[in-house]
Amino acid sequence: MSEQNHPQTEPQLDENQIIALRREKLHNIRQQRNAYPNDFKRDSFAADLHAQYGEIGKEELDPQGIPVKVAGRMMLKRQMGKASFATIQDVSGQIQLYLNNKGVSQEVLDDFNHWDLGDIVGAEGTLFKTNHGELTVRVSGIRLLSKSLRPLPDKHKGLSDQETKYRQRYVDLIANEESRNTFIKRSQIIQSVRNFMVGEHYLEVETPMMHPIPGGATAKPFVTHHNALDIPLYLRIAPELYLKRLVVGGLERVFEINRSFRNEGMSVRHNPEFTMIEFYEAFSDYERMMQMAEDIIRNASHTVNGTANITYNGKEVDLESPFERLTILEAIKKYNPHYTDEQLNDAEWLKKEIVKHGESLPPSPGIGSLQLALFEGCAEGKLWNPTFIVDYPVEVSPLARASDTKQGLTERFELFVVGRELANGYSELNDPEDQAERFKAQVAQKDAGDDEAMHYDADYIRAMEFGLPPTGGCGIGIDRLVMLLTDSQTIRDVILFPQMRPE
């Protein structure tokens, strides 16, 4: 189908000429009537009509003369003698329209033949099946509801330029069914997570997006200024410390799904603003949090894919089986069996090996930090099926509870799937004096040049001094979860309007 039978054929024109021609058409419409009417009332969606009537045979359907009113964007159009066909697209799918001079006046047909692909129309008529069995609306009335002044991408090539996809998401959503389905699935994933949390008796809350002190994660914040108070404020890098204040206050199970902001680099896995869920449960620990994370992810996969055995980038991922658990050193040795325990506890050897794997040396020189940096360089990217890495060093876990049995380690985990981090959680540190000392250590790191080290949060210490129950907490990156469950290779494919360099 094409517009080649139109009175003037757009494919022979460049984009500026097409826009000029369409503006002229709009000007002519304005001379005759309201060019943007708002009184057409749709009563049917394309997908609902196909679901209800798609399997009914022509002989049974046609005599019923079922009346419908449909509306959408015109995606295809062709003329066959005195009759015209068009396909319109609404949020649910597409349906075909059929017009001839028996159903509408010649004047309406003439108007219709001057309309363009991309125009938004409303049509009413009755359902029938073509000789080829396609469900179609026999049009008795049709109106132009909104003129498209810019041409759509070629229907065969689609919107292939990645930069344009992200900058002009509105065009991408029109042209690419795959993109539409990804964002529909994103909504379903978030809803499944929310429903799961409510089913576990968690209370959804909202905490501040602007913080007087950045905290809850080691990251570089965005800074703004509050004019009335004449103070700097920081877009939140994580909601953690506010959510734990609520646990102190007696809200024993809380969660928040919202945006966080980090003033850092962009990549296929990173966007400066991103969505995450954080949840906290009193009288719980990191074992419970690992099970919660596992159940949330598995449930979301079943919701949108009907299975927890999925494919990512052409390779199978098993979300159904219990997730593997390894320590940092176990993971390193799993993929590098030639490393010895002596080497993995030798700071100078670790530094050389970290550089060899292309990683930067951590600001903190402790053995734990060096082991973590080596893990990131030689093992993290190989963790394909879901794997919890557990028992992180104290020096890289300033908010996590120290292990009672493992010297220098904490009850902390990170979850990795398809070679990247998806979740982070721990048994929360609830000793206010220990927390104060760790904040001081973070301040010392910041003074030594670590921009991502935490600030000292005196109010959070004050809250802890009222008594924080034993608590487990976890954060899951929603964007990365959507990437995983929709087989999307870059975070920009799952964020409607990702951050881009100015045009």
UniProtKB/Swiss-Prot annotation:
Main location: cytoplasm
Reaction(s) catalysed (UniProt annotation): tRNA(Lys) + L-lysine + ATP = L-lysyl-tRNA(Lys) + AMP + diphosphate
Binding, Mg(2+) 1: E414, E421
Enzyme Commission designation: 6.1.1.6
MF terms in GO: ATP binding; lysine-tRNA ligase activity; magnesium ion binding; tRNA binding
Enzyme class per UniProt: ligase
Name of this protein: Lysine--tRNA ligase
GO biological process entries: lysyl-tRNA aminoacylation
Binding site for Mg(2+) 2: E421
Entry keyword set: Aminoacyl-tRNA synthetase, ATP-binding, Cytoplasm, Ligase, Magnesium, Metal-binding, Nucleotide-binding, Protein biosynthesis
Organism for this UniProt entry: Neisseria meningitidis serogroup A / serotype 4A (strain DSM 15465 / Z2491)
Highest taxon above the source species: Bacteria
